[in-house]
């Protein structure tokens, strides 16, 4: 019987040749979990990596926090060897501080350092970091020149289209490449779009035509078929998947949620919650897991009252008991329908 929670996708998990390289780092596979603040922590990354995500990228961390309080935020850089290649994503607006931060976290032995130039949040962008850097191309050049010269590992960047009044994506991509960047990921939305509206895949294709380093596309990959569709449309080497993976980590195994049996979902919720509680502690782990639980249950298309009953359980034992009761019934229904 197929194990939906551990089987690697046949076309990628058994590859002997890399799909592409980031600097000297071989990447096996073409679908990657996107870094997402509040979501791409070790529990979720490790699950997605096990299902076929080609590498792991951490949640972003501000350079000043790394310099002045690394011991308090080091958990964000937690990874295990099975996740490699691992990229640490950092952000800031000062080239010297980003360099100092990168040198410090390099000691934790990631494979890659990634610079966030795409976060649209006001607190980040309007301080000149995240997508705010896309308004300052000379600063981007200094950042990549300094880091690529000083670090022993590849440096990459993640960008957006830019701002509605300053769409600098091709300029920034060329600057990243010319100043030592080893790859670039492109979220095909503007700062103002945030995470809404339609992603413009033409932008990814334009960046791919403008640079020789690997390009990773991001935006509106919602179902498994979109992975190949984006690659064919844009020519990008790989695809990043963010929100569509929350509640459906099986997308990295080229499965849509409708293809995953209820019992596999039930087992995954157990596994994911256990990792959350082991990582954060029982109380905080349960609290932080609710946002994942909501998506697992929402995508099961359960009645709202049923979802609410499960989500309102205050402790892990009661939550899992309510979950098991519902999913056992779903599995029986699924088996019955298959026999009919």
Residue ranges of model-derived segments:
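Alpha/beta catalytic cores of nucleotide-metabolism and tRNA/nucleoside-modifying enzymes
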Residues: 1-23, 27, 31, 37, ...
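Glycine-rich, positively charged N-terminal anion/phosphate-binding segment
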Residues: 4-21, 36-111
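N-terminal small/glycine-rich loop or linker at the start of catalytic domains
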Residues: 20-32, 64-85, 119, 124-127, ...
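Hydrophobic faces of well-ordered beta-strands that scaffold small-molecule active sites
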Residues: 31-34, 56-58, 86-90, 113, ...
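Active-site beta-loop-alpha junctions enriched in small/polar residues
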Residues: 36-38, 61-63, 91-93, 118-120, ...
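Alpha/beta enzyme core
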Residues: 99-129, 138-213, 233
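Short glycine-enriched, charge-decorated loop/helix-capping segments at active-site entrances
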Residues: 128-134, 256-259
């Amino acid at each position: 019987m197929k194990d939906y929670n551990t089987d690697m996708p046949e076309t990628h998990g058994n590859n002997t040749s890399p799909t592409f390289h980031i600097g000297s780092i071989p990447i096996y596979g073409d679908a990657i979990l996107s870094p997402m603040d509040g979501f791409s922590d070790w529990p979720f990354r490790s699950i997605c990596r096990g299902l076929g995500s080609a590498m792991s990228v951490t949640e972003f961390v501000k350079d000043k926090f790394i310099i002045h309080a690394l011991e308090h935020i080091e958990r964000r850089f937690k990874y295990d060897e099975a996740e490699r290649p691992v990229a640490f994503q950092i952000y800031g607006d000062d080239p010297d501080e980003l360099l100092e931060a990168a040198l410090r976290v390099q000691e934790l032995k990631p494979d890659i350092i990634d610079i966030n130039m795409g976060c649209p949040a006001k607190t980040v962008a309007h301080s000149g970091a995240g997508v705010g850097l896309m308004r300052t191309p000379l600063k981007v050049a200094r950042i990549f020149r300094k880091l690529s010269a000083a670090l022993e590992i590849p440096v990459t960047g993640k960008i957006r289209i830019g701002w509605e009044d300053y769409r600098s994506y091709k300029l920034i991509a060329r600057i990243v490449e010319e100043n030592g960047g080893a790859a670039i990921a492109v979220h095909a939305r503007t700062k103002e779009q945030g995470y809404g509206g339609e992603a413009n895949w033409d932008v990814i294709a334009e960046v791919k035509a403008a640079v020789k380093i690997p390009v990773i596309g991001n935006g509106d990959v919602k179902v498994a078929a979109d992975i190949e569709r984006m690659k064919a449309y844009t020519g990008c080497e790989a695809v990043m998947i963010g929100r569509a993976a929350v509640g459906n980590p099986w997308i990295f195994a080229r499965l849509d949620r409708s293809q995953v049996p209820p019992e596999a979902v039930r087992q995954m919720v157990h596994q994911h919650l256990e990792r959350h509680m082991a990582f954060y502690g029982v109380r905080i782990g349960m609290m932080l897991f609710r946002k994942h639980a909501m998506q697992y249950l929402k995508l099961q298309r359960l009645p709202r009252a049923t979802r609410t009953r499960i989500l309102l359980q205050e402790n892990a034992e009661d939550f899992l008991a309510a979950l098991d009761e519902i999913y056992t019934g779903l599995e029986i229904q699924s088996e019955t329908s298959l026999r009919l």
